[in-house]
Amino acid sequence: MKFSYWGAGILAVALTVTLGSNTLFASQPLTAATEYMQKNDSDSIKVENLAKELKKLKPISSDDFKSKFKKEISGFKLTEATAFEDKETGSYATANYAKGSKNVYLMVTDGAGAGAEQVKGNLLSYLELKAVEEPGDKTNIKNYKGWSVYFDHSMYENDKMTSIQYLEGNRYSVVASGTNIPLDELKSLLDNISL
């Protein structure tokens, strides 16, 4: 497609006027949008650098992975722990903790070696969600253990389900799902986990 000099000039003026006022539809000054983009870019670079370092590491063995789960955390007792090794996707493990009617299920992926791509993908998706997050959403992206991570209340109040997806120890991608446990109590339990 060829543009005439007039067409290119009109397009340049239109872009300058649009970007010079407020960003389209957001009613934010260009400086605020630019600052957010720069922060998001620096967060993305941080994620990329982490993934490069994780790829260099050797994945944890299944026996060592299972042994990382404490028998009891904040009154929750470990009822089950399993771990697996896969050359294509890396090592991963699951654990279940229970206390009365409260239940916390953990799915953990070792970010070392092949698992680095999953860790990278998760962290980048949290950054993307943060960009569209609105007040009142049941899903919130918060800073937790040094990274932007996913905090989620259930869509339905009566099912009492919560979820936190985060990065533990700059290596392990954790999905923690709770039943009959409020989000703040789930976070408190996760504060006491160290892999």
Each language-model region and where it sits:
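C-terminal segment of classical bacterial N-terminal signal peptides
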Residues: 16-24
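Bacterial N-terminal signal peptides that target proteins for export
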Residues: 1-10
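Short, solvent-exposed recognition patches
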Residues: 49-160
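Short, aromatic- and cysteine-enriched interfacial helices/patches
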Residues: 3, 24-25, 124
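Long, hydrophobic/aromatic N-terminal blocks
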Residues: 25-62
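A short, solvent-exposed beta-edge/loop patch
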Residues: 29-43, 131-195
